[in-house]
Structure formats: structure tokens, C-alpha cells
């Protein structure tokens, strides 16, 4: 009998140990609830901060179509190319409706090309077109002329050559409209520069080719002087 009691004691103790491990003490439960509540607070705070940051950024940097037109103009409309190949030319048109004749005469429009890193690569100044030249460039001719009493409508065109050495990728076009005494009006648009394969030709300068320039015969002299 004594031996049997001694033999069953380890099993009973192991069962009690398992039951003890399955039951959490009140302090452990409080710690778990505290950690869980802290995680929920941190998650809510992160979502709240992200939402506030997005709203502040949207309010501070409005999209180009919502920018306020300067007081010198009634309307400013711009057309930018979306993509262009290496070695080609990018053309942008600007339809500006000035409120006064002097503002139309002194308006300066510049087109800036920026690299993917944001650095200025090239800047050109747009030139004004006469009303008859608007339709030839494909611009809506209905926008030409006077939009309302006293306003002056003029179209500018900027031509920007794309170098064959510029890397293809996502670049940025930046238009700047300036009037003396007023704040510049800036609008940006993405420009995709596509890679273009150019044919390669080689001309070997051997003795046969260089002998042509050294030919002093009368027949070659007549050909060169013609």
C-alpha cells in the first residue's frame, strides 16, 4: 500500500502542475489587457496622424487645376505633352486671358524642364502667336479673341528640344507665367522621355578615302568649284 501511494504521487503532482499553468493570475491578466489596450491606442494614433498629415498636405499643395489664377488674368489654360522621344521637340501651348492690355504686353512665359532628381536641365521662353497662327498649331480657335469686355486673349508657344544624351525616364515640365509687379504663376506636369535607337554609320578614313581630297586633277577641281 505504501509503495502504491509513493508510485502515484508523481502523476498527481504533474497533473496539478498542468492545471496550475493553465490558470493565469490576476496580475498577468491585467498585464495582458494593458498591453492590448496600448497596442490599440498606438494603432489608432498612427491612423489619426496619417489622416491629419494627408489633409494638411492636400491643403498646403493644391493640384495644378485648383491653383488660384493671378489677379492680372481672367483665365490661364495650358497644354503639355505627356511623352516625347530622345532627339525630338516638346511643344507646350499657353492660352492667357489678361484683364488689361499692359498685362498682355508685359507677360513673360517660361518653360522649364527638370530632371527626375528635380534639377533644372533647360529653360526656354515662350513666344506669343498672332490670332491667325493659333488654328495652324491645332489649338482651339474658339478661345482666341476677347473672352469678356476689356480682357485680352493671347496664346504663347514654347518649343523645347530634347537632347539625345538625356536619360529616359520621368521628367517634369514647369511653366512659369510672370507679370511685372505680380507673383509668378507656376504649374507643373510630368513628361516621359522615351529611349530612341539611332542608326549608327561609320566612315573609315583609309588611304582610298583621303586620296579624294588630295586629287589635284582638272576634273576634280571642276567638281569642287561647281
UniProtKB/Swiss-Prot annotation:
Superkingdom, taxonomy of origin: Bacteria
Protein name: Uncharacterized protein TP_0703
Region annotated Disordered, chain positions: 1-20, 205-226
Amino acid at each position: 500500500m505504501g509503495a502504491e501511494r509513493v508510485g502515484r504521487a508523481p502523476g498527481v503532482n504533474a497533473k496539478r502542475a498542468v492545471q496550475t499553468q493553465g490558470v493565469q493570475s490576476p496580475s498577468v491578466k491585467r498585464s495582458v489587457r494593458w498591453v492590448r489596450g496600448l497596442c490599440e491606442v498606438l494603432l489608432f494614433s498612427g491612423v489619426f496622424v496619417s489622416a491629419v498629415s494627408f489633409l494638411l498636405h492636400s491643403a498646403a499643395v493644391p493640384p495644378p487645376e485648383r491653383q488660384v489664377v493671378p489677379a492680372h488674368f481672367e483665365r490661364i489654360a495650358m497644354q503639355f505633352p505627356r511623352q516625347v522621344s530622345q532627339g525630338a521637340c516638346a511643344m507646350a501651348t499657353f492660352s492667357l486671358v489678361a484683364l488689361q492690355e499692359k498685362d498682355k504686353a508685359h507677360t513673360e512665359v517660361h518653360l522649364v524642364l527638370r530632371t527626375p532628381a528635380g534639377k533644372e536641365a533647360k529653360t526656354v521662353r515662350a513666344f506669343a502667336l498672332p490670332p491667325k497662327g493659333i488654328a495652324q498649331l491645332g489649338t482651339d480657335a474658339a478661345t482666341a479673341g476677347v473672352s469678356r469686355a476689356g480682357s485680352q486673349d493671347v496664346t504663347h508657344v514654347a518649343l523645347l528640344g530634347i537632347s539625345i544624351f538625356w536619360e529616359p525616364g520621368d521628367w517634369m515640365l514647369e511653366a512659369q507665367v510672370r507679370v511685372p509687379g505680380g507673383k509668378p504663376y507656376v504649374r507643373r506636369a510630368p513628361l516621359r522621355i522615351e529611349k530612341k535607337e539611332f542608326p549608327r554609320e561609320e566612315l573609315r578614313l583609309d588611304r582610298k578615302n583621303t586620296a579624294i581630297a588630295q586629287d589635284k586633277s582638272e576634273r576634280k577641281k571642276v567638281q569642287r568649284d561647281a
